[in-house]
Regions:
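Enriched for short, Lys/Arg-rich terminal
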Residues: 2-4, 10-26, 31, 44, ...
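Generic structural signal for secondary-structure transition and capping sites
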Residues: 38-41, 55
């Protein structure tokens, strides 16, 4: 079942940044978003559950320095960020 994809303001700002700065990274992000929809907790980008104050969130590697941080609910995949590292 496909879930609705939504973005927090910070996640959308990050996504728009990649649209203007780096098409290759944007293509990788789009591929990861499709994979997250199919398999939220396994697949490409080494999915990893976050801990401590970020429990309930997951991250996937875009590249060596950037991660997608997201949360999955019954009906949505919420993108919190897709630029930098989740500790930034």
């Amino acid at each position: 079942m496909t879930k609705e994809l939504s973005f927090k303001d910070s996640g959308w700002a990050d996504y728009l940044y990649w649209q203007t700065k780096d098409k290759k990274t944007l293509k990788k992000i789009n591929a990861l978003l499709k994979d997250i929809d199919r398999n939220p907790f396994s697949g490409e980008g080494k999915p990893e559950p976050l801990k401590y104050n970020k429990q309930g969130y997951w991250s996937r590697r875009i590249d060596g320095t950037n991660r997608i941080v997201y949360k999955v609910t019954d009906t949505q995949i919420i993108i919190v960020g897709c630029k930098g590292h989740y500790d930034d």
